[in-house]
């Protein structure tokens, strides 16, 4: 059974190789012109620095190689199948070229300076089905050989160049891909590549211009975009590109709804083939009431993280044309043409309006059906009145019936006659007067002539 090994500071010009169960680097070891190789069967703790021409770290599947010791090497090879490498806590790692083939193992590594993912011996690029997290504190990360991940999580691959820089600081730290070199992901996974400058990286070529898989003004801490990432590979820049905006004036009719935004706003200055990103509000300001408003389109294009050069447009909300309709009631003839009406309108249901009129008249006072009723002097008032206009219309019309008035006639008498063989009767109407007619229901002022016909019950 292999024993545990503690490396207590070995400084040579020759190669160093350590094989044991668990290995602890307790003091700095150096072989600057040759190689250091650590082969373990258990966990490896790197608590002090290692400095070599080529540094190789391996252990058994399921074990962990970790520590705060600074790793300095021209070539850094990780080839432990299934080994988990946690090497992102040291502050002064200085690796020139990194290559890894680790099977199901996870790899987290942060270099203090620029480094390259390349080829070391028989290992080219990085191959893993675990999670991959690479970072440089400052400096570029150059991807010269392919990175292949079969991990299926939302953090399958994270590459972050210039991690010490904040969003909007696009200096010193870009991810640069060699010609034809790619990051290959599982279809269910998400990968994120954080880079600084649009001009000094090659993400558009590798990810694909026009794919919509780019975000801006963001880093691993600050997220200035709101359009969520789905599966696939994304390029996330610290740089904040700026769009110029232009907008046409907008006129809308009052409808009780807030102005949702100016869909005529156009933008120029897109990068990476982006088109029509989600512009927050398009200059919306929740304006509802009639009036004229100056609105500024500004702020960030929240979907992707762009900034916008402000522009102005005028919003005019015109009053809604109020259409007042009337319904008239049927009435019994009363000698006048006065009508009784109810008013209604096309106002917004939740608005407060009071409708009024100064007169409603039938075409004449006489009984009849479907008689025209004219309603004049239309007006309205109320808390919402300023949002409406009659547009010069002051009257409306409808129809209704005037039914005949029932008349009770008294004062008619039958005249006596000599038998003449028939039942014909004659009547005396002299007892019918205006007074008796009015008392019987005639409208005062009307004139009626009463006549009567009839017959005896027998001859």
Regions found by a protein language model. Give the residues of each.
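Extracellular lectin-like interaction modules
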Residues: 1-240
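Short loop/turn motifs that initiate or flank beta-strands
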Residues: 2, 57-60, 70-71, 78-81, ...
């Amino acid at each position: 059974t292999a024993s545990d090994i503690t490396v207590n500071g070995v400084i040579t010009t020759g190669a160093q190789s350590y094989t044991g169960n668990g290995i602890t680097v307790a003091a700095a070891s150096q072989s600057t012109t040759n190689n250091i190789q650590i082969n373990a069967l258990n966990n490896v703790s790197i608590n002090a620095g290692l400095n070599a021409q080529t540094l190789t770290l391996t252990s058994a599947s399921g074990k962990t190689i970790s520590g705060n010791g600074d790793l300095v090497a021209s070539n850094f090879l990780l080839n432990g199948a299934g080994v988990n490498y946690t090497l992102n806590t040291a502050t002064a790692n200085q690796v020139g070229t990194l290559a890894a083939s680790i099977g199901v193992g996870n790899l987290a590594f942060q270099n203090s300076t620029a480094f390259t993912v390349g080829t070391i011996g028989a290992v080219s690029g990085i191959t893993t089905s675990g999670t991959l997290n690479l970072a440089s504190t400052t400096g570029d990360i150059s991807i010269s050989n392919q990175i292949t991940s079969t991990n299926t999580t939302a953090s399958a691959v994270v590459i972050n160049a210039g991690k010490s820089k904040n969003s909007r600081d696009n200096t010193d730290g870009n991810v640069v891909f060699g010609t034809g070199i790619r990051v290959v992901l599982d279809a269910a996974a998400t990968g994120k590549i954080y880079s600084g400058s649009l001009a000094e990286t090659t993400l558009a070529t590798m990810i694909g211009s026009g794919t919509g898989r780019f975000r801006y003004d963001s880093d691993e801490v600050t997220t200035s975009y709101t359009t969520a990432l789905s599966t696939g590979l994304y390029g996330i820049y610290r740089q904040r590109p700026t769009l110029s905006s232009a907008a046409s004036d907008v006129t809308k009719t009052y409808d009780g709804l807030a102005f949702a935004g100016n869909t005529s706003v156009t933008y120029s200055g897109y990068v990476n083939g982006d088109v029509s990103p989600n512009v927050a509000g398009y200059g919306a300001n929740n304006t509802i009431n009639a009036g004229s408003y100056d609105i500024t389109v500004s702020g960030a294009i929240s979907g992707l993280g762009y900034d916008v050069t402000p522009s102005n447009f005028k919003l005019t909300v015109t009053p809604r044309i109020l259409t007042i309709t009337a319904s008239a009631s049927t009435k019994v003839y009363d000698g006048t043409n006065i009508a009784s009406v109810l008013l209604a309108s096309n106002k917004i249901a939740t608005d407060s309006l009071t409708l009024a009129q100064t007169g409603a008249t039938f075409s004449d006072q006489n009984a009849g059906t479907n008689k025209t009723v004219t309603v004049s002097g239309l007006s309205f008032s109320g808390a919402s009145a300023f949002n409406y206009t009659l547009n010069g219309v002051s009257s409306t019309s409808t129809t209704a019936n005037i039914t005949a008035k029932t008349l009770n006639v008294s004062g008619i008498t039958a005249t006596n006659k000599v038998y003449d063989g028939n039942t014909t009767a004659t009547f005396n109407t002299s007892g019918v007067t205006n007074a008796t007619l009015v008392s019987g229901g005639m409208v005062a002022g009307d004139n009626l002539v009463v006549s009567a016909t009839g017959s005896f019950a027998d001859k």
